[in-house]
């Protein structure tokens, strides 16, 4: 019997090792798997490379992980916000490495990994500092820069509901990077508000099929993470 549901955060996260590359879903705090991140902090893993759209907000979620010093590098498109002071302090002190990737390129590079593609050409970033040292190509009169896929050891994502086969449905904007990140990791761990019985999820509403998910863990979101 296929049963990908995990009883505890520790059970779901136990495979994560030091030095892992981890995709973390979310657009700011919307769709951020805060409880999975808290569980990762408790495990005490270190030398992590994190791939996410942002670099954390306040002292919550991803910022909380950064504050522990467990992250050696972050790959993101929007590292600085009014409340990104944790990342800002670490970066200015030389305690974290940053790779900035334009948001569209970030999504495309993750998608490329999930689809099993090799490097992709994109016009975004050509002629800027972000393209330095990368191969370029002129195609049909337009210049492109070559970008590598972003493949990860693990993906931590947040969905609305899931079943024991790993099928997931999302809620509104919380969906964001979740579906493509689930495809681009060797192991995908999804936190959900509820694990429902097989057949309860309308197949037409399933966005991420279970083939891309290895663990589903139900969590009760804290007030700070209760929003989509």
UniProtKB/Swiss-Prot annotation:
Q: Which PROSITE patterns match?
A: COA_TRANSF_1 (PS01273)
Give the EC number: 2.8.3.6
PANTHER family associated with the record: ACETATE COA-TRANSFERASE SUBUNIT ALPHA, KETOACID-COENZYME A TRANSFERASE
Swiss-Prot/TrEMBL GO biological process terms: beta-ketoadipate pathway
Pfam families (UniProt xref): CoA_trans
Q: Gene3D superfamilies in the record, alphabetically?
A: Glutaconate Coenzyme A-transferase
User: To which protein family does this belong?
Assistant: Belongs to the 3-oxoacid CoA-transferase subunit A family.
| The protein's name | 3-oxoadipate CoA-transferase subunit A
Cystine connections: none
> Which terms in the Gene Ontology molecular function aspect does this entry carry?
3-oxoadipate CoA-transferase activity
Q: Which gene is transcribed and translated to give this protein?
A: pcaI
Instruction: Give the reactions, separated by semicolons, that this protein catalyses.
Output: 3-oxoadipate + succinyl-CoA = 3-oxoadipyl-CoA + succinate
Binding site residues for CoA:
25-31
Q: Which UniProt keywords apply?
A: Aromatic hydrocarbons catabolism, Transferase
EC main class here is: transferase
Q: Subunit structure, briefly?
A: Heterodimer.
Question: Which pathway does it take part in?
Answer: Aromatic compound metabolism; beta-ketoadipate pathway; acetyl-CoA and succinyl-CoA from 3-oxoadipate: step 1/2
Organism whose genome encodes this protein: Acinetobacter baylyi (strain ATCC 33305 / BD413 / ADP1)
């Amino acid at each position: 019997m296929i049963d990908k549901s995990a009883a505890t955060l520790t059970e779901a996260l136990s495979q994560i090792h030091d030095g892992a590359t981890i995709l973390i879903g979310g657009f700011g705090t919307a769709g951020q798997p805060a409880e999975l991140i808290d569980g990762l902090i408790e495990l005490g893993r270190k030398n992590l490379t994190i791939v996410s759209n942002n670099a954390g907000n306040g002292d919550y979620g991803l910022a909380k992980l950064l504050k522990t010093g467990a992250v050696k590098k972050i790959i993101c498109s929007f590292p600085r916000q009014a409340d990104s002071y944790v990342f800002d302090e670490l970066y200015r002190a030389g305690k974290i490495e940053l790779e900035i990737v334009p948001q569209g390129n970030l999504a495309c590079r993750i998608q490329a990994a999930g689809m099993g593609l090799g490097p992709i050409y994109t016009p975004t970033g050509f002629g800027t500092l972000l393209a330095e040292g990368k191969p370029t190509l002129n195609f049909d009169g337009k210049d492109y820069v070559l970008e590598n896929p972003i493949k990860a050891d693990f993906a931590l994502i947040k969905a609305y509901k899931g079943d024991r086969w790993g099928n997931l449905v999302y809620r509104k904007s919380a969906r964001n990077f979740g579906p493509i990140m689930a495809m681009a990791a060797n192991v995908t761990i999804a936190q959900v508000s509820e694990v429902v019985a097989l057949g309860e999820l309308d197949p037409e509403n399933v966005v991420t099929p279970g083939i891309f998910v290895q663990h589903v863990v139900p969590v009760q979101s804290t007030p700070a993470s209760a929003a989509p």
